[in-house]
Structure formats: structure tokens, C-alpha cells
Amino acid sequence: MSGQILSLLAGMVRVAIPISFAALAGMLSERAGVINMGLEGIMLIGSFFAVVGSYVTGSAWMGLLFAALSGILMGLVLVTLTVGFKCEHVLAGVGINIFASGITIVLLEMIWGTKGKSGMVAGLGMLRVPVISKIPVIGDIIGTISPLFYILVLCVFLLWFLLYRTPAGLRILVIGENPEMAGTMGVNVYKMQYLCVMASGMLAAIGGAYLSIGDINMFSKDMVSGRGYIALSMVILGNWKPLWVALGGLVYGFAQSLQFRLQGVNIPPQMVQMLPYILTLVVLLFARKKSSAPAASGKHYYQKGE
């Protein structure tokens, strides 16, 4: 296989990592009946606090922990608004996005004295797995890659196992389809929703951390650049199933990687920049008829007596 094709595929996987993390986050939240429209903002918060953590401690892994904790906190805010106070899910998510865009700029200026970008910090670097790197083609694509790729693969398996092989997963699936029925079965619907949305926030924030300490080792204003919204479309493309949702990120990753390699070709740059979004929309048009969202996603649940 030619070097250009291998480079294209390697770029596809790297670009897909943050999208897939965020898409898994959106899938888990919706499975519990809560639409996480705040993925964009939570990713931005995660990317910022990953840099802050790395800057303060000197360790990129501590930065990743900072990002995960910030995501859990933002997930708690979102689920409190949507489940606790019964706010509209979309409005609550948009509010999270606006808040994240503003607070990161304020904190950026407080810590680094600039509104544009932070200083360089320690990054996660690349992980080379000798066994995988020796496999033809596959080794060229994922033999040397961010350790977050392997964390992503682990998360896909764990979410699949949780949802389809455990009693807790069955409860989550029932809540997403019919929370009233889950309540009559003795399931603590609110507790499960809180846990799922907080875990969703953690996953989205880790995806955001990849953009900073997993790639350029710094934070830049609004660096998520719409990836949270793209991730929501990947949830639909993957039909709310962990493996297919994660693989859906490869669609955008391929288009984005192809865009990078078409720069300099005799094509209007505006058309090249539109390519990832056009391809995503086209794929969604074909996939939407086969997708089936959880029936109770975005709907408020009321316990008896409320």
C-alpha cells in the first residue's frame, strides 16, 4: 500500500479520536434519556483544564485527570439543569457551550495573560506498541499513536459490556425507552441519569484533552471548532450503539484527513474546507432512515408525587 494512502488512514484515525470520545459521551447520555447538547462546551473545558493540570503539575497524565474531573463537574451541572430543574435539554446544552467559551477565555487571561492561546505544556506524546507496529499496514496506521487511542478502544468495550451484558446496562436502556416503566420496576431513574450524564461529561472532556495535551500541547481559544456538534451526528450515524458510534468518528476523520492532503491542489480552498461537513451530511442522509433514537431521549421524567 502506498505511503500516501497509509498517511491518509493514519491521519483519519488520529482525527477521529476526539470525535469518537465525544460521540460515545453523547450516546451514553441519550441512552439514559438526556440529550447532551453541551458536548462542544464540555470538550472545550476538558481541553483547557488538561493544559492547566499539565502546567500546574508538570505531568500530562495529571492534566488528563484534571480534564476528566472537569468533565464530570460539567456533566453534573448539565444533569442538574435537565433532570433536577427540568430545563429544556437543548437550551441547557447551548448554555453550557456559551459558558465554556467565555470562561476559558477569562481563565486563559488570568493564568497566561493572553486571550488567544496558552503556553506550551507537557503532552501525552505517542505510544509505540512493538507487537502492533510490526503488523503490515496496521502497524503503519496505529503502531505509533496517542495512548488515548487505546483508552478509547477500552471505553468502547466497557460501554458495550455495560449496556448489553450487565443489569445496570439493562436499566439504562429501559430508562432511555420508558423511564416510567423503569420507575415502576424499582429503578432509581434519577440516580442512573445523574451517573450516566456525569460519565458522559468525563468522556467528552477526555476527547477535548486529546486536542490539547494529546496533539499540540497547548490550549487555543475555541479550539474544539464544532467537533462536539459533529459528534452528535456520529451518535445518529452509529444508531446509539457503542462500536458503531465510535467507528462513525472515522467518517469525519477520513474527510478531515483528506482535506489536509488536498490543500495546495488546484481546488478552491473553500470547497476543500467544506469537505468534512459535506461528507458527514451525505452519510447522515443515508443513515438516518435506519437509525432509531431512544424513545424517551430529551423528555422529562417525573417521579410519583412530583
What do the predicted segments below correspond to?
Residues 204, 215-277:
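Transmembrane alpha-helical segments in multi-pass inner-membrane proteins
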Residues 58-103, 154, 252, 256:
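Alpha-helical transmembrane segments within multi-pass membrane transporters and channels
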Residues 1-22, 35, 49, 57-62:
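Membrane-interfacial amphipathic/re-entrant helices at transmembrane-helix boundaries
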Residues 141-219, 247:
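Helix-loop-helix "hairpin" substructures at the membrane interface of multi-pass membrane proteins
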Residues 177-191, 262-306:
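Cytosolic-side transmembrane-helix boundaries in multi-pass membrane proteins
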Residues 9-12, 41, 61-69, 91, ...:
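Hydrophobic alpha-helical transmembrane segments
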Residues 22-23, 47-51, 101-105, 149-161, ...:
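Hydrophobic core segments of alpha-helical transmembrane domains in multi-pass membrane transport
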Residues 101-165, 267-272, 291, 299-306:
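Transmembrane helix-bundle core of multi-pass membrane transporters
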